[in-house]
A protein has these predicted regions:
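Ubiquitin-like/PB1-type beta-grasp interaction modules and other compact soluble beta-rich domains
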Residues: 1-107
Length: 107
């Protein structure tokens, strides 16, 4: 079977737990793209740093880690499951729903 040259995924970035906005997009990405590529392609500004495990996203849309408590920061899930690998290591196959949210807010 011919390998598709592109995949389509949906992504939502949700900062509502910290009073920020939420945005969603449907993206067409090259085959072999990662969750990191999807974030980079969705048009939301973000900051990330390279670590020994891969790219670590520390800020999205101006909302940074640890702004709302020492454990607060961005997490992602794919099809409702939280992955324990860096977003730059999670290769997408197409059809996934990616959800980024700002977690562990201390009120």
């Amino acid at each position: 079977s011919q390998q598709s040259a592109s995949i389509t995924v949906s992504i939502t970035v949700d900062g509502s737990s910290a009073g920020a906005g939420s945005s969603s997009a449907t993206l067409t990405l090259p085959a072999g793209a990662t969750v990191y590529d999807a974030l980079a392609g969705c048009g939301v500004s973000f900051n990330a740093k390279a670590t020994g495990y891969g790219m670590y996203v520390n800020s999205i849309a101006g909302l940074a880690e640890k702004e709302h408590g020492g454990m607060s920061g961005w997490m992602y899930s794919v099809n409702g499951s939280v992955a324990n690998i860096a977003c730059s290591s999670y290769v997408l196959s197409g059809g996934e729903y990616i959800y980024w949210w700002y977690a562990n807010v201390e009120y």
